[in-house]
Amino acid sequence: MSKNININVNYLTRVEGHGNIVVEVKDGKLEICRLEIVESPRFFEAFLRGRSIYEAPHITSRICGICACGHTLASIQAAEDALGIKPTEQTTLLRKLLLHYEELDSHILHIYLLVAPDLVGVPSFVPLIKSHPDVVRRALRMKRLCNELCDILVGRHV
């Protein structure tokens, strides 16, 4: 039996975004094990050229529908760094809380929209409405709670 193995998964499914996995084993030794992120460029930097610094957080929040808060906060931090502004401890803590909300929200979407269909043997989330309505209700309830938390933290969910 050969001790050489090459694995190339050129399109990962059930993930947020696009990625590949590359694994190479030579003479029984792992040589390469790599996750490749293959997102297409979206050129948001070009959208920001010539715009007011105040527009950047709003524009960058549209980079991703899953992690809008992270992109918004990165934009705000870049502006603060450029202007030499140091946020207060309270602001920093609120931002961390917002990122924790977003992580929870992302996990809910991942588990219920991307993983649950595979666990019950259906091709997507939609068939779960009939086959597992309790799972769908739980997913919607958790998503609604996350949206309400975001409303409390920043005035609206993104």
Predicted regions and their residues:
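Catalytic cofactor-binding cores of redox enzymes
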Residues: 2-158
